[in-house]
């Protein structure tokens, strides 16, 4: 791809409306990824390890269970300890969700806007490291939101009573919900 095919000159991002030539193996791989979120996460998601830098996402058994639970249930509540990889698991699933489904609206909400934006930036890092043939073209890309050419959108915001007011969302990820004041939590 030439520079004009990249979003704002970023060679890691495919610009919207850029045709991609697929070979047979890529078509089969795309179908496999579309049908199996776990396969997609294990094969294509990259994360930052504090010790090793950028590495493939090594999915633990409890994370496999979380992915299956989220994929097969409309509502999911997970009560998990800190630093267990739950956010990495969820953002991997969110990425799968918006890539392989059109017109999806996802809200990432956390007790602080900075936390929500950090989660979105981790998702964006994983997105940048996908092969171009797996990427949807990028319409907009910033610290607070991501819009893809398939009509899917992800927004990051602090958890407040007005955070998602006026919008319709297919998925809402509430991180650090224990730190949200009870009067705000009741609005959800």
Tell me the role of every PLM-derived stretch.
Residues 1-188:
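Phosphate/NTP-binding elements of NTP-utilizing enzymes
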